[in-house]
């Protein structure tokens, strides 16, 4: 590793000092903990999800899953070079979309269910219209969004005409899909962006990064509004709380955490019963009372968010869980894994 010159070291020290000051200011305003305030609340039942369906069709690691707004259909992306749209009620495939690049890392369904987007190591985001077929009978590609200098790690639709992406070049991009142009393009973090979650009202979003921080953004502006610290390793995934007043995050540092936007800091921390797994993806129930995280050991863990009590483990996958997604009505959880399976938990 090259030696850091004194001037650069001075800047590092100054930045670290500022960060520590932010942390100290936040800590000074923490007059109580969530556990203290919720100690007299009743316990929630142990999580009752069980693996009801296994969606088989991929022949390589499945890296991502996302539900459509109808809570019935979901899309998965795999290193076999295919997107598959599933009917989760019947476990049937609705469409199979072959990709030009097999290295897909993220997928997204538009809330309307009209479009899906994907991207990965091809350094671009590709959008398909699921209601229109090309000459070969597969969903028609309508946009190829290029200009990235790193892999695409996350993408989410605001609506059928607008998309937000995060990528390995540390950038956040906003796209007008009708025109096929970027409306915003800016550096979001000091490291690869790993996850992105939209607020319930679609006016703000949270990003997580390998720089160990999460940030709050307004969809209308470039600069972040708030920055959150706490994790000791990469922030793998973030998920907005259904109230819109907070969010959860998880990391391979073997913790998940809850942050309150109004308190401007972490309010809870969740750990597995045995500290033997890091986490790759997180989701909150529609009530916000349950937090679920997919683990690198192949299980989905659940906690009572208020009392910070572990409420169960969903077992079935045989390898690392890569992504989990809860359908909008909260009745089904989908998980993907390196074991090539997509599991539905009901």
From Swiss-Prot:
Gene3D superfamilies the UniProt entry points to: YVTN repeat-like/Quinoprotein amine dehydrogenase
Molecular function GO terms recorded: phospholipase activator activity; protein heterodimerization activity; signaling receptor complex adaptor activity
Residue stretches spanning the membrane: none
Expression by tissue: Expressed exclusively in photoreceptor cells in the compound eye (at protein level).
Subcellular location: Cytoplasm; Cell projection, Axon; Cell projection, Rhabdomere
SMART domains referenced in this protein's UniProt entry, alphabetically: WD40 (SM00320)
GO cellular component: axon; cytoplasm; heterotrimeric G-protein complex; rhabdomere
Record bears the keyword Zinc: no
Family classification: Belongs to the WD repeat G protein beta family.
Function according to Swiss-Prot or TrEMBL: Guanine nucleotide-binding proteins (G proteins) are involved as a modulator or transducer in various transmembrane signaling systems. The beta and gamma chains are required for the GTPase activity, for replacement of GDP by GTP, and for G protein-effector interaction.
Protein's name according to its UniProt entry: Guanine nucleotide-binding protein subunit beta-2
Species name: Drosophila melanogaster
